[in-house]
Amino acid sequence: MTKKDLGYSLTTYGRGKTGYKTRKYVEGLLTKEQALRKAIKLCTSTNLVDIDKDWETVDRYGESEEHSRTFGTVHMVKRKTGNAYILQTFDKDGWESYTYDLKADGKMTNRR
């Protein structure tokens, strides 16, 4: 594993009836999978689950050179079939989105 594979910085937030909740950050030299798992754990442990279906990204980094490091944003959305987590990563080529469904057995499936 190279250093290029590490360095994901993730933001999680919940949007409920009272507006956006406090943002929590997970930073460090992590792989995408590690960062996603940490962010999901943070989401569930802090009850950040109230995002309605018209969720939107409110954090836009990568606009300047100082934020050119690869990072991601995790959104947790409620679905009829269960919880789904949207992982958006940003790099020099732009935005990429992945959808992970958290199954009952705790395993994630990438539905990109």
For each feature predicted by the language model, list its residue ranges.
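Short, mixed-charge low-complexity intrinsically disordered segments
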Residues: 1, 44-112
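Short aromatic-glycine-(Arg/Gly/Cys) micro-motifs in beta-strand/loop hairpins
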Residues: 2-24, 86-87
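Polybasic, lysine/arginine-rich low-complexity segments
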Residues: 3-4, 15, 32, 41, ...
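A generic structural signal for ordered secondary structure
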Residues: 5-7, 25-32, 108-111
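A general secondary-structure boundary signal
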Residues: 8-11, 38, 42, 95-98
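A short, exposed loop/beta-hairpin motif centered on an aromatic-Gly-Thr core
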Residues: 18-32, 99-101
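A short, charged, amphipathic alpha-helix used as a generic interaction element across diverse proteins
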Residues: 30-50
